[in-house]
Structures are given as structure tokens and as C-alpha cells.
Amino acid sequence: MIILWDKITYLFFHLPRVLKNRLKQYGEGIMNKNSDLCYTNRELSWLSFNERVLNEAANPRVPLAERLTFASIYQTNLDEFFMVRVGTLMTQMSSKERICENKTGMSSEEQVKTILKKVRELEIKKSRIYEQLMGELEPEGIKIINFAKLSREESDMLEEYFDNYIAPFLSPMIIAKQHPCPFLANKQLYAVLLLKTQKGKNKIGIVPCKNTVFKRLIEIPTRPGNFILSEEIILHFVSKLYPKYTIREKSIMRVTRNADIDATGVYDEDLDYRDMMENLIKKRNKLTPVRV
């Protein structure tokens, strides 16, 4: 019994020291030279959590409607992550002082680089799961389609819908010397165009795609349960908004802005708490972009 207890005591007190010397890396964990334990970086740990949320969207044992909800939660989480956590790291990178995370010793630059690599992998996975979900929605009578799958008659019908119900509420803009780049709101969709003038000069056009008047999902009248995105309709007929230009390239863009704001710089003794929070929100909505 005494010998057995001695062995247990040895394992309890000495084995961690042996493991400490031999353990260099475990999964995503990185050994900090000044630490007694092996840690996983906070940001990478959070991305692993969000990946588990995404995995639920692909889990066949979960009801389809809930899987769609999980996919939506994943995207919302990722937006908030970039706004707050990546925004904080971007702010640290802009400072002259080199700031390192105290658990793993990773600098702000190293964390951002690792985060972007992981997010690219997650976005590929998300696209695959999205296609899977869309395929499973078809037997339920719901389908998201694009212009390539529409007949000529249906395309003409959507063009009429664009002329009457979408175009009147759009505000097309052109970036030029006399017209600097407009402010792009956080998490909003924009149609971005490379335009060519009659003299051969290149200009950039921007069309905000969000509007409270028309819906984002528009049902095809001849196909009940078949929908098309309003931004795709805008992008398809956007040349009608720029009749004097030739459109060379076009795409949909979405900006995610930094939401990491220091309240001390906005504090004013003459303002009450409500006014101070209003100023904070206004300033927060106009911080620099962290993702496009």
C-alpha cells in the first residue's frame, strides 16, 4: 500500500513537470515560455466555438429550420467577432508599442494573421453547408434561384419590377474628384461598379442595396416558393442607373467596421449619460473598416 501511494504521489507531483518540459504544442495551444501551462489563444478558441455552431447547421439530426438558424447565428457571431475582437487587434496594431497576448505570447499581428487563415477555412466550409441546406429546402418547396435559371419572360417580368418598385428608391453614386467616396455603413450591402466613360476614363460607381421599401427576398410570380435576392436584381439591371457609362465590372460588397471604441475620449462632464452614449454610438458607427 505504501509503495502504491508513493507511486501515486510521484505521478501527482512530478508528472506535470515532465509534461511541461516535453509538451511544446497541443492542438491550437501554444506554450508560453513564461507560463506553467499550455493555453489556446482566446480568439482561436472563440473561432472553434463558432465552428461548432456552424457544424450544427450541417448536423442531419437537427431539424432543417433549426439548422438554418444555426447558420444565421454563425454569420452574426462572425460579424460581431470582427467588429469587436479583430477591431481591438487592429487598434493595437496601429499603436507603436508591440502588444502581445499574455497567455500564448502571440502579437496582435500574429493573431490577426492566424485568425484570417482560420476564417478563410470556415467560409469555405460555410459555403458548402449553405449549398447543402439550399438543396434540402427544395423538396420543401423553397428555392433561391439566379438569373441564369430564369426564362426570358420571367427576366422581363423582373425588369418591370425593378423599374417600378426598386429603381425609384435607389441612390446611384459616382466616385470622382468632385465626388469623394461616400461613407459605407456597417454591415450594409452595396453594388460596386467599374465604369468607363465615353472618353475611355475609368470611374467607380456605388449603389446602396438596402431599402426599407422593397424586400430582400422577392418571389418569382410564375414560380411559387422560388425567390431571388433583391441585390442580384439590382446588379443585373444596374446599367439602367448609369446610361452614360459602360459597365466593365460589377460586384456586391459588404463592409464590417471596427466597433472597439475608447469611451474615455468621448467623456464630457457637461453631458449626461444618455447624451454620452449617443455620442459613443455615432462615433462607433464611423470607425475604420476591418473587413470587406
Question: What positions do the PLM features span?
Answer:
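Short, Lys/Arg-enriched N-terminal segments with co-localized hydrophobic residues
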Residues: L11-I30
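Extended, highly charged clamp/arch subdomains and adjacent linkers
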Residues: N34-Y39, L44-E66, N77-V292
